[in-house]
């Protein structure tokens, strides 16, 4: 794309490779080698390029404005490694130094200058992974995500976070050992505070230097792919940091943010909202995420705070209704549709995941039918209900059993992902293990039950770091996980349990092959509120099945009976109360032959002992006969 076409498509919102036009680029003009700099500041009175190569303010280089508000200059002065900024003169006459919004490298904190560095093209070795990803997709594949804050998974002795070179050596073997299919990172784009979570960004193309270099992250992703692990990154297209030296009021007027003051300001988060209806902002944001997908070979993007982009009144501050008198943010809705259209045309095999907390419908609906076109939506309703239930004293659970069963009413209204994320283990909410009811033994039993329920429930899975071994204290972003917990045998066994559970999930197609329709699940009994027991079947297209039974009460139930559709010998393949995982059972239930007898609509019954606060999963070891099979429950 030549310069004129790049400028035209930028102004029409159709330039999705903006990093090749704006920013700093090696160039040659009239036989002279140097760098061309371009920045969008349409209402600036003047823009000067300053940096190491100008002795900063001493020899500022004036830039020239074109008709679209892009300022440009070519100079031979810069060299590799030099730091630069733009000195922007506003209409008020005030001058302010600003970052380059398209910078791929930023200097180390506390500075915010862009660094001139040549981007070397990596010779990737993950071709087989990418080919498999394209061929297999992800809807009918196992997706079990380990959510990580890169700055606090592990830290060095001096308290500094691990770089991605170190995470490559430590985290990837851990992911393999724990049998996860994907790892998801909280934002890795440049943000003002190194100890923050990263959700108020300043550099949408720049890698957060706290975690090393872009090249180190490329190597990390490649090594993940070579170990059959996908990589997902959080991205924040709705709002950005209010810091003066970043994008805020870039040229002295609303540039990236909305013109209206209240729409521009996100009062609850102390941030600014992108003007998602502005063509140039659309080019900027979509180029950002395409760059991350292409440059780092990412397998998925989790779009943060989607509700904030869909509703004008989502924030706590004042707001104005739309042209129809409602609270729908039409610009945000159309932007998200367009975002997913562009990404899916280029990368149909890259997951687009919405973190969306409202009751808005069609988040994962087809764009052609008015949906937003995401592949998955976080099921926040399921997460809130299920955590409330597992925190409750079992005495009262029979009165709130609908908290467990209600999700089956809407489980396929969207393509759901079931999250136990970082948001649930901070700010006084307690860790996942600490949320569980009872003494220490029962808390671990409850956590084993909970994680098994998550694995068996339709939908893809996500678990925040530390929860896999039952960390007791809340997550603290400025400290590493409590790895010392693993000196305690209960935590060590919990870690082993999670690794085995993740392997069990990957190895059993009924748990993931049909995650998007009722064809993949059959409820046996959701009405046993008095005993707080839930049972259902997960199935494959070929009719293979797992019988999943959950006892949410601390009472062992001997001679417990449920109905099953097939006459067969059944074997227990999962029991959360085995000694090796911190329970009291020395071994599995013995194999059981089903018995003829009508149980609800089922022609056969299965009787066994159900562990206290335990989950028991059964599969057919050998079919005996195919008589009186419940219609549609299995296929020939």
From Swiss-Prot:
GO terms for molecular function: 1,4-alpha-glucan branching enzyme activity; cation binding; hydrolase activity, hydrolyzing O-glycosyl compounds. Its EC number is 2.4.1.18. The keyword Glycosyltransferase applies. SMART domains: Aamy. It catalyses: Transfers a segment of a (1->4)-alpha-D-glucan chain to a primary hydroxy group in a similar glucan chain. Belongs to the glycosyl hydrolase 13 family. GlgB subfamily. Keywords: Carbohydrate metabolism, Glycogen biosynthesis, Glycogen metabolism, Glycosyltransferase, Transferase. Signal peptide: none annotated. Pathway: Glycan biosynthesis; glycogen biosynthesis. GO terms for cellular component: cytosol. Monomer. NCBIfam families: branching_enzym, PRK05402.1, PRK12313.1. HAMAP family: GlgB (MF_00685). One of its GO terms (biological process) is glycogen biosynthetic process. The keyword Glycosyltransferase applies. This is 1,4-alpha-glucan branching enzyme GlgB. InterPro entries: A-amylase/branching_C (IPR006048), Branching_enzy (IPR037439), GlgB (IPR006407), GlgB_N_E_set_prok (IPR044143), Glyco_hydro_13_cat_dom (IPR006047), Glyco_hydro_13_N (IPR004193), Glyco_hydro_b (IPR013780), Glycoside_hydrolase_SF (IPR017853). Catalyzes the formation of the alpha-1,6-glucosidic linkages in glycogen by scission of a 1,4-alpha-linked oligosaccharide from growing alpha-1,4-glucan chains and the subsequent attachment of the oligosaccharide to the alpha-1,6 position. The active site is at 304 (nucleophile), 355 (proton donor).
């Amino acid at each position: 794309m030549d310069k004129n076409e790049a400028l035209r498509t930028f102004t029409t919102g159709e330039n999705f490779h903006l990093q090749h036009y704006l920013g700093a680029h090696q160039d040659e003009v009239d036989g002279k080698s140097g760098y061309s700099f371009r920045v969008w500041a349409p209402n600036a009175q003047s823009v000067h390029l300053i940096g190491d190569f100008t002795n900063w303010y001493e020899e500022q280089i004036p830039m020239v404005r074109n008709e679209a508000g892009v300022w440009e200059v070519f100079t031979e002065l810069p060299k590799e490694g030099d730091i630069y900024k733009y000195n922007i003169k506003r209409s008020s006459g005030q001058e302010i130094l600003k970052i380059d919004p398209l910078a791929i490298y930023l200097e180390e904190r506390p500075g915010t200058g862009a660094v001139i560095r040549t981007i070397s093209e990596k010779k990737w070795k993950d071709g087989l992974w990418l080919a498999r990803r394209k061929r297999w997709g992800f809807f009918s594949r196992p997706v079990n995500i380990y959510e990580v804050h890169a700055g606090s998974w592990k830290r060095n002795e001096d308290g500094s976070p691990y770089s991605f070179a170190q995470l490559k050596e430590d985290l990837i073997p851990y992911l393999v050992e724990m049998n996860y299919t994907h790892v998801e990172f909280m934002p890795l784009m440049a943000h003002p505070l190194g100890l923050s979570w990263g959700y108020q960004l300043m550099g949408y193309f720049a890698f957060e230097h706290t975690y090393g270099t872009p090249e180190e992250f490329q190597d990390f992703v490649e090594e993940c792919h070579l170990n059959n692990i996908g990589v997902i990154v959080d991205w924040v297209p709705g709002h950005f940091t209010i810091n003066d030296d970043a994008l805020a009021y870039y040229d002295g007027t609303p540039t990236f943010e909305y013109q209206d003051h209240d729409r521009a300001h996100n009062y609850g988060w102390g941030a600014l909202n992108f003007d998602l209806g502005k063509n140039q902002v659309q080019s900027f944001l979509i180029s950002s995420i395409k760059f991350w997908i292409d440059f780092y070979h990412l397998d998925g993007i989790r779009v943060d705070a989607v509700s904030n982009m869909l509703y004008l009144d989502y924030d706590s501050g004042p707001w104005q209704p739309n042209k129809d008198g409602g609270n729908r943010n039409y610009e945000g809705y159309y932007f998200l549709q367009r975002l997913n259209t562009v990404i899916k045309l280029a990368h149909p095999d890259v997951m687009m995941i919405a973190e969306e907390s409202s009751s808005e419908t069609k988040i994962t609906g087809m764009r052609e039918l008015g949906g937003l076109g995401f592949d998955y939506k976080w099921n926040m309703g399921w997460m809130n209900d299920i955590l409330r239930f597992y925190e409750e004293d079992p005495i009262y659970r029979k009165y709130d059993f609908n908290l467990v069963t209600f999700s089956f009413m809407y489980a396929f209204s969207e393509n759901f992902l079931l999250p136990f994320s970082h948001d649930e283990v901070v700010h006084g909410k307690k860790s996942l293990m600490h949320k569980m009811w009872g003494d220490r033994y029962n808390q671990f039993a409850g956590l084993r039950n909970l994680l098994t329920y998550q694995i068996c429930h339709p939908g893809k899975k996500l678990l925040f770091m530390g929860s896999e071994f039952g960390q007791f204290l809340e997550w603290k972003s400025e400290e590493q996980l409590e790895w010392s917990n693993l000196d305690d045998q209960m935590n060590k066994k919990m870690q082993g349990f999670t690794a085995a559970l993740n392997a069990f999930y990957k190895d059993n197609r009924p748990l993931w092959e049909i995650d998007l329709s009722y064809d993949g699940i059959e409820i046996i009994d959701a009405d046993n509120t008095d005993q707080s027991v839930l049972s259902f079947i997960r199935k494959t297209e070929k009719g293979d099945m797992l019988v999943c039974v959950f006892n949410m009460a601390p009472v062992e139930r001997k001679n417990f009976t449920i109905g099953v559709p097939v006459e067969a010998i059944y074997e227990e393949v999962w029991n959360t109360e085995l000694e090796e995982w911190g329970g009291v059972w020395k071994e599995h239930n013995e194999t059981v032959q089903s018995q003829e007898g009508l149980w609800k609509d089922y022609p056969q019954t299965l009787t066994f002992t159900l562990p206290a606060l335990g989950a028991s999963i059964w599969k057919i070891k050998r079919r005996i006969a195919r008589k009186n099979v419940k219609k549609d429950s299995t296929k020939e």
